[in-house]
Amino acid sequence: MTDVDSKVVGNASLEHPVISEEEGAAAFARVMAQLKAQVGIEAYTSWFGRLKLAEYSRNLVKLSVPTAFLRSWINNHYGSLLTNLWKQENSAILRVEVIVRGMKRVSKAVVCGKNAAPVVLEEKTASSFLENYTEHSVRGVEAGIFGSPLDSRYTFESFVEGSSNRVALAAARSIAEGHKSALRFNPLFIHASVGLGKTHLLQAIAAAALKRLKPARVIYLTAEYFMWRFATAIRDNDALSFKEQLRDIDLLIIDDMQFLQGKSIQNEFCHLLNMLLDSAKQVVVAADRPPSELESLDLRVRSRLQGGVALEIEAPDYEMRLEMLRQRLKVAQQDDNMIVISDEVLQYIAKTILGSGRDIEGAFNQLLFRQSFESDLSLERIDEFLGHLTRSGESKRIRIEEIQRAVARHYNVSKQDLLSNRRTRTVVKPRQVAMYLAKMLTPRSLPEIGRRFGGRDHTTVLHAVRKIEDLVCDDQTLAKELELLKRLIGEQAA
């Protein structure tokens, strides 16, 4: 071992020598693929979609999640499974920890180069996060609000308006300003893909309403926080007090509705929603899909949410992307007036990055970082290090109906045949193929897929999936058909 290598291991940890970031990322991807296969797409998306690798050494794995609730849920329900999967990946692993990411943004996990000692970045523990969370909640109560803390950056003033979000913004302002007309679209349901500004808009409503209402009876909650508070209240025999707090409000704002899980929790939320709407209290909800597609939700909740107005925020156009970059530059220059980025560069990034606002933010942060040690960045160089973003647009979600149409057209049957009880060979095979593709290409659960295929049981869907999986190994014609259908469905959804 060289002197440099000795220093690397010594500085990292004698007990847990650090593995390179590339190795860690590859191992994490393999374990996550195994996890998804075991728990299913829906459970994986709900509970592990925001799981990140924080640290990976020879004997220790640290995974991070954004909330204490997620940490607790994963530890209680999937802790043993995670540990077993990591031990299958690396038999030397002794411990797998799930920690909570801090409120403040931190750099990525440990990086270990050949000629540089690794820096183990500080992560907040669950206990420190809970202390921080409690502090924020106390401040919220003093300001007239309890629940998830608000980010001071998320205001109407900092929200970039454009054609893709103008209607949603107008509705949000109307609610925040207390216009009587707002009750006409109650509840307001805002849906959009990741990174398009849902959370920003919801927190802007809460912040503006808090300033206007005296006393302020406004509650902003993520669905996860609602679940955690409800579970904690039941555990502490304080459910009645919790319900009373929620019912004595003027404005309820719920974010990430797609994560609301559990029959008893959904039942309680349904009662709360009915009570507030029947009392002409304003409700605002956001999710990553429209109410009709939240199939894990109780039918009564979905029905009530569909009774208001659902507005979609779409991906930003060029003008919006450019304005986001200009605003981001102004904020950065307030911290460091030596930062100089030409408008030509901002225009180039706005033209080439076609994804979400989060992609824009990521590109700008990359640019700032590179500029700190590469003073003269050409457009070619920028395109080089932003390549993973410049060619990534937000792909449209594939729907089961689109799969059914494509399969019916390919096999020359009707969509109604796929949903029927007909058992002829000419219908059974296309139906099984469509169910298989629905499982592979969408995040829907087996029961949800069964309902979309004429109200079938989830075991029927599982049988179809396994049947196609068995056949495709030996049937090259079927394998080619599946690849063709996947391509046609992808083109149809693009």
Swiss-Prot record:
Any one GO molecular-function label of the UniProt entry: ATP hydrolysis activity
Subcellular location: Cytoplasm
SUPFAM superfamilies recorded: P-loop containing nucleoside triphosphate hydrolases, TrpR-like
One GO biological process term: DNA replication initiation
Stretch list, region Domain II: 103-148
GO CC aspect terms: cytoplasm; plasma membrane
Residue ranges, annotated region (Domain I, interacts with DnaA modulators): 1-103
Annotated stretches, region: Domain III, AAA+ region: 149-371
Alphabetical keyword list: ATP-binding, Cytoplasm, DNA replication, DNA-binding, Lipid-binding, Nucleotide-binding
HAMAP family for the chain: DnaA_bact
Family that this chain belongs to: Belongs to the DnaA family.
Domain notes: Domain I is involved in oligomerization and binding regulators, domain II is flexibile and of varying length in different bacteria, domain III forms the AAA+ region, while domain IV binds dsDNA.
Name of this protein: Chromosomal replication initiator protein DnaA
Designated gene of the protein: dnaA
